[in-house]
Amino acid sequence: MAEIEREVRSLVAKIIKRDEKSIDPNANIFTEYGVDSLLGVEILAGLDKKYGLDVPEQKIREIKTLNDIIRITKDYISKKAG
């Protein structure tokens, strides 16, 4: 699962144009890193392309931090594998 964390961090960093190491996984990505709805859609599209992840609207509303994105991605992959 650590690999998933690295991949998701890399994906988000690339989209928001930040160095991976500079992203605080607990910081609000909207207020701290200027993620707007378009960048949010780009992040979700990247997750869909990489993992086939289709995030339900209810879960989208829960996303505030990089850790939220990682958790939702891991949950999806676990359910898909199980």
Residues covered by each model-derived region:
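Phosphopantetheine-dependent thiolation modules in NRPS/PKS and related acyl-activating systems
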Residues: 2-35, 39-44, 49-82
